[in-house]
Regions:
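Bacterial N-terminal signal peptides
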Residues: 9-17, 517
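Extracellular beta-strand/loop-rich repeat segments of large surface/secreted proteins
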Residues: 303-304, 311, 338-339, 368-453
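A short, hydrophobic C-terminal helix/tail in secreted or cell-surface proteins
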Residues: 505-522
C-alpha cells in the first residue's frame, strides 16, 4: 500500500497551535473530512453554495463546527483512494473556540485562512476549504478581512443586498477566486487599502472579485496595492450616474509597482455606464493592464475610468478593452473603456493604450500615448490640460476650454520635436476664446528663426475655426521668442503647424504697438 503525504503550503510545525486574540476570528471549514462525495456535493448541492450566516455563532447545517474559531491545531488524517488503493495523509484543522462562541464585529480582524492545510481531493471526496458560501443577513461592520490560500474552493461571500463595511485593510493572498458582493443593493466600504498578493497568475479563475457581479457602490479610503503579478476585478452595477458622482471611488492610487498585474473594471454585461474613480494610477511595468472582464457574459460593458489625481502619477501599463472572450475565443466583445481626467495634478499614461472609448479632460493634466495603429473615441476638452506622448489619436475632438500641451516628455525636448495629436474626424472649436498651446517652458533657442514649421495637430475637418490660425491659438509657457501658427493641407485634412521667431509676426507686432501707443496716451493725459 502506498502512502503519500500532502504538506501544508505555509509550514506550521506539526500539531502547532495557532491561537488568536479575542479580536481575531477564523472562519471555520464546515466540511472537513466529512460528508461530501467525490462530486464535491452534499444532498446534490455544491459545498460552496451551502449558505452560512456570517454573523451567526451557531453550528451550520452538515457540520459539527461553529462558524467562528479563535484558533486551531493541525493534525494528520489518512484517506484511502477506493480505486488505486493509495493512502494519502492530509493536514487538516482542529479548531478552538472561546468559552462563549462569538461572531465578528467592528473590532474583529476576520481571517479566511487555509494556508496550513492540505488541498482536497475529488477522488476520495475529501474537501475542506471555505465550504459553504458566506452569507450576510444584515448590514455588517468588521475591522479587517484577510483571505489567505483559500484555494481548494472558491470563497463566495454573498452580501444579499446588505452593506459591508471594513474599517481597515482587505488582503487577498490566494490562488482561487474570492468573491465579495452579490447584489446591486449592496454598498461596500473599505477604510484602508486593498492589498492584492494573489496567485501570480492572470486567469479569471485566479481573480479577486471585489463587488462580485456588481454591487451598488464601492468606496475605498486608501489605495489598491498590487504586490504580485495577479488579477483583480472591481465591479459595480449602480444606478445611472456621471463622472463626478462615480459608483466606485478609490481615494488613493492604484499602484501596480513593477508587476504585470491586471485590473478589470466591471464584470458581466450591464446597460448602464459605470464610473470607477481613482486618486491616480502608478506602475512601471509596461505589461500591466487595466481593462474590463472578458467573459462572454460581459459583452457590451461600458466602464469609465475617472482620474482624480491630487498628486502626479505615471502608469506605464496599458488601458485597453478586450476584443475576444476568454471563455469562448469565437465570441467578439464590444466592451468599451473611457477615460475622464478630473483631478488637480498630472496623470501620465505612457503605455500602449488602445481603448476604444472617449477621453474627456475636465481639470488637471492628462498626458496620453496611443498605441501604434490604434485610435480612441472622441476627445473633449472642457478645462485643464491635455498632451500627447509621441502621438495621441482620436475619432473626433471638441474644444470648450483648457489648453493643449507640447514638449511634454524628455524625449520630445531632446529631439526638439513636439508631439502630435491626430483627429480622424471633425475638430470642433466650440469655445469662444483662444486655445492655449502650452509649450511647458521648453527652451526654444535652437528653434528660433530656423525657418522650420512643426506639425502639432492633424484633423480630417475643422468646424468653428477662423481662416487664420493665430486668431484661434495662443502660445503660453514659451521661454524664448514668439510662436506663429498656421493651417496647411495635409495627407487627409488640415495640419496645425507652429514656427518660432525672435520677433512677433507683423499682425501681432502691430497689435502690440497699438497697445503701447494707448498706454503712452493714457500716461500723457495724467
Amino acid at each position: 500500500m502506498k502512502i503519500k503525504k500532502l504538506f501544508p503550503f505555509a509550514a506550521s510545525a506539526f500539531f502547532c497551535s495557532l491561537s488568536l486574540s479575542a479580536n481575531v476570528l477564523y472562519w471555520v471549514d464546515a466540511t472537513s473530512y466529512f460528508n461530501a462525495d467525490a462530486s464535491g456535493k452534499i444532498d446534490g448541492t455544491s459545498i460552496w453554495n451551502i449558505a452560512r450566516d456570517f454573523s451567526s455563532t451557531e453550528k451550520s447545517e452538515y457540520s459539527d463546527n461553529y462558524n467562528w474559531a479563535t484558533g486551531y491545531t493541525v493534525k494528520e488524517v489518512s484517506a484511502q483512494d477506493s480505486v488505486s488503493g493509495q493512502t494519502t495523509v492530509y493536514y487538516v484543522p482542529v479548531y478552538e473556540y472561546a468559552s462563549t462562541v462569538t461572531a465578528p464585529d467592528e473590532n474583529t480582524d476576520v481571517y479566511f485562512k487555509c494556508d496550513d492545510f492540505s488541498n482536497g481531493s475529488d477522488s476520495i471526496g475529501y474537501r475542506y476549504r471555505i465550504a459553504g458560501s458566506i452569507s450576510l443577513g444584515a448590514d455588517t461592520t468588521v475591522k479587517s478581512i484577510n483571505i489567505q490560500r483559500t484555494d481548494d474552493n472558491w470563497l463566495m461571500f454573498r452580501t444579499n443586498g446588505h452593506d459591508l463595511t471594513i474599517l481597515e485593510d482587505v488582503v487577498y493572498n490566494s490562488y482561487a477566486v474570492a468573491l465579495i458582493g452579490s447584489s446591486s443593493s449592496t454598498n461596500i466600504k473599505v477604510g484602508g487599502n486593498v492589498r492584492v498578493l494573489g496567485s501570480g497568475g492572470l486567469s479569471r479563475y485566479n481573480a479577486f472579485r471585489l463587488g462580485g457581479d456588481g454591487v451598488g457602490s464601492i468606496k475605498i479610503g486608501g489605495g489598491i496595492i498590487f504586490e504580485k503579478q495577479t488579477r483583480m476585478q472591481l465591479t459595480t452595477a449602480g444606478n445611472a450616474s456621471v463622472f463626478d458622482n462615480p459608483q466606485s471611488v478609490v481615494s488613493g492610487i492604484a499602484d501596480f509597482s513593477g508587476y504585470a498585474a491586471r485590473l478589470d473594471l466591471g464584470r458581466r454585461s450591464g446597460a448602464i455606464e459605470q464610473f470607477y474613480s481613482f486618486g491616480g494610477l502608478s506602475g512601471s511595468n509596461s505589461d500591466a493592464v487595466i481593462s474590463t472582464d472578458a467573459e462572454t457574459d460581459s459583452n457590451g460593458l461600458v466602464s469609465t475610468l475617472v482620474l482624480a489625481n491630487s498628486s502626479d502619477a505615471v502608469f506605464a501599463g496599458k488601458i485597453t478593452n478586450p476584443t475576444t472572450a476568454e471563455d469562448n475565443a469565437s465570441t467578439i466583445l464590444t466592451n468599451t473603456v473611457n477615460v475622464v481626467m478630473n483631478g488637480s495634478a498630472a496623470q501620465t499614461l505612457s503605455g500602449d493604450n488602445d481603448f476604444r472609448g472617449y477621453v474627456t479632460v475636465q481639470s488637471g493634466t492628462l498626458l496620453l500615448r496611443t498605441a501604434s495603429g490604434a485610435s480612441h473615441g472622441k476627445l473633449t476638452l472642457n478645462g485643464g490640460k491635455f498632451g500627447a506622448i509621441g502621438n495621441a489619436s482620436f475619432a473626433s475632438a471638441e474644444w470648450n476650454g483648457g489648453s493643449i500641451g507640447f514638449f511634454n516628455t524628455d524625449d520630445a525636448i531632446a529631439l526638439m520635436t513636439p508631439e502630435t495629436v491626430t483627429i480622424n474626424g471633425e475638430f470642433l472649436k466650440a469655445g469662444s476664446s483662444k486655445i492655449a498651446v502650452d509649450f511647458n517652458g521648453v527652451d526654444t533657442y535652437d528653434l528660433i528663426d530656423n525657418g522650420q514649421w512643426y506639425d502639432l495637430i492633424e484633423a480630417a475637418s475643422l468646424s468653428g475655426f477662423s481662416d487664420e490660425a493665430d486668431d484661434d491659438f495662443i502660445a503660453v509657457n514659451l521661454s524664448d521668442g514668439y510662436a506663429e501658427f498656421q493651417w496647411v493641407d495635409g495627407d487627409f485634412g488640415k495640419v496645425l503647424q507652429v514656427s518660432f521667431s525672435s520677433v512677433p509676426e507683423p499682425a501681432a507686432f502691430a497689435a502690440l504697438f497699438g497697445l503701447l501707443a494707448l498706454f503712452a496716451a493714457a500716461r500723457k493725459r495724467f
